[in-house]
């Protein structure tokens, strides 16, 4: 049986850190899923990312929330979300490290153990 994977990459988003109310900026999301009989419009994935980022958040939770919504609307347990971005709470206050880019990865279903699928996220 043929297995199709759909991936949107470099989706721009931003949010605000719930700890410091500081901007998380230049964030890029990669969202992938293996359809379970239902394929959603590609713009929906970007809309989900925007919606989740528009509240006080942690980067880790953004990935989890996007994955939860993708699972709910597609019916697929095979979902992956990779987020990379800068945090002004790191670059503009405290330690002041401007080039520190944070990456979080949320892997579910087949993405957890399948190295080929994980390579597809790059």
Where do the language-model regions lie?
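Residue-level signal for pocket-adjacent positions within structured domains
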Residues: 16, 40, 102, 106
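Short, small-residue-biased leader/transition segments that mark boundaries at the very start
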Residues: 2-6
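Short helix/loop capping segments that flank catalytic or ligand/cofactor-binding pockets
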Residues: 15-18, 91
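Short terminal or interdomain "cap/linker" segment that borders an active site or interface and mediates
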Residues: 78-122
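Broad gene-expression machinery/nucleic-acid interaction feature
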Residues: 8, 26-30, 78-80
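Well-ordered alpha/beta subsegment
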Residues: 50-86
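Histidine-centered catalytic/metal-coordination loop motif
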Residues: 19-64
């Amino acid at each position: 049986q043929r297995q199709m994977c759909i991936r949107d990459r470099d989706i721009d988003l931003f949010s605000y850190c719930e700890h410091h109310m500081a901007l998380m900026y230049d964030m890029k999301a990669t969202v992938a899923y293996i359809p379970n009989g239902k394929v959603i419009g590609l713009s929906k994935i970007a809309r989900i990312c925007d919606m989740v980022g528009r509240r006080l958040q942690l980067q880790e939770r953004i990935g989890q929330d996007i994955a939860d919504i993708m699972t709910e609307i597609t019916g697929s347990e095979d979902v992956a979300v990779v987020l990379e971005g800068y945090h002004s709470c790191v670059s503009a206050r405290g330690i002041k490290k401007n080039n520190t880019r944070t990456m979080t990865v949320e892997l579910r279903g087949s993405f957890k153990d399948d190295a080929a699928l994980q390579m597809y996220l790059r």
